[in-house]
């Protein structure tokens, strides 16, 4: 699986996030936003293009139907942000807090989540293609009725995550950890797991193993 990284210009203009509130259309492009804090904000279908965010805080904000292309978030707090029906392409989240962040019905393609907190994140009914989760906390994350294609979980914490009505065929969970998952036998067909995880799945599915 090859993930296309963000195509971000090496020459970005420094801007304050507040400029987006003064635009006729809420668009940020070709810019760098550093250290800004705008919590509990509302933006009507915002669009971020070719932009980098560093040490920004947007907790409890409503960014529903946001469009992001060629964007990088580093050390940002996006906890409880609403990104319902978002379109997120060629984007990176690095060392970010996405606790309880909502991505229902989103389209997420060529996206990397690295060293980030996504406990209680909601991705129900999302289309997720060419996406990697690396060293992420995803406990109690909700992947209900998602469409996965080229999705990887590398050394993640997945305890009590939900995958109901989401096929894990071709997904490699072998380097990740969990005690229990909310999943059925149909969803785990074709999933790649470690020997220990195979025993865990057998227990989750009600099988009794005799030695």
Task: State what each model feature region is.
Residues 2-211:
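Tandem repeat scaffolds
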């Amino acid at each position: 699986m090859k993930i296309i990284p963000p195509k971000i210009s090496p020459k970005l203009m420094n801007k304050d996030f507040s400029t987006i509130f003064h635009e006729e259309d809420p668009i940020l492009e070709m810019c760098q936003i550093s250290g800004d804090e705008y919590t509990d904000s509302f933006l009507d279908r915002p669009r971020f293009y070719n932009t980098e965010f560093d040490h920004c805080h947007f907790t409890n904000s409503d960014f529903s139907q946001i469009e992001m292309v060629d964007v990088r978030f580093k050390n940002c707090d996006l906890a409880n942000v609403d990104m319902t029906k978002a379109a997120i392409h060629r984007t990176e989240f690095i060392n970010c807090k996405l606790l309880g962040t909502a991505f229902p019905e989103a389209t997420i393609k060529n996206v990397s989540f690295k060293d980030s907190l996504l406990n209680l994140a909601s991705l129900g009914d999302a289309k997720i293609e060419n996406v990697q989760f690396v060293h992420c906390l995803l406990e109690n994350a909700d992947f209900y009725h998602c469409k996965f294609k080229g999705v990887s979980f590398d050394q993640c914490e997945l305890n009590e995550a939900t995958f109901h009505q989401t096929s894990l065929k071709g997904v490699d969970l072998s380097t990740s950890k969990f005690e229990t998952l909310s999943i059925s036998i149909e969803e785990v067909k074709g999933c790649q797991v470690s020997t220990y995880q195979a025993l865990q799945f057998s227990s989750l599915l009600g099988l009794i193993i005799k030695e």
